């Protein structure tokens, strides 16, 4: 269940994301709880085999949010906007 999942992230990374991309990990968690997950995939980069990615809608745009699962804890790595996935998921 989503309610049982604990989300963690780097406070410094969150500050950088807010400053540079105007989006935060708190917004991601809120979107997850608000059922805005469009998909969950393996990280498309072969360099990160241990990661998954939320494909999530925030403010009518699609973002990828890579994360690592450790029992019931999800460690969110970053957030980046995706034109490619916006075209696919928000036609």
PLM region spans:
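Ribonuclease/tRNase effector modules and their secretory precursors
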Residues: 1-91
């Amino acid at each position: 269940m989503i309610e049982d999942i604990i989300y963690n992230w780097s406070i410094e990374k969150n500050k950088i994301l807010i400053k540079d991309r105007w989006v935060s990990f708190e917004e991601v968690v809120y979107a997850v709880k608000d059922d805005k997950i469009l998909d969950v995939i393996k990280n498309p980069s072969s360099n990160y085999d241990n990661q998954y990615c939320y494909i999530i809608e925030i403010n009518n745009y699609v973002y990828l949010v890579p994360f690592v699962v450790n029992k019931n804890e999800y460690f969110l790595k970053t957030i980046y906007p995706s034109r490619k996935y916006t075209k696919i998921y928000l036609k």
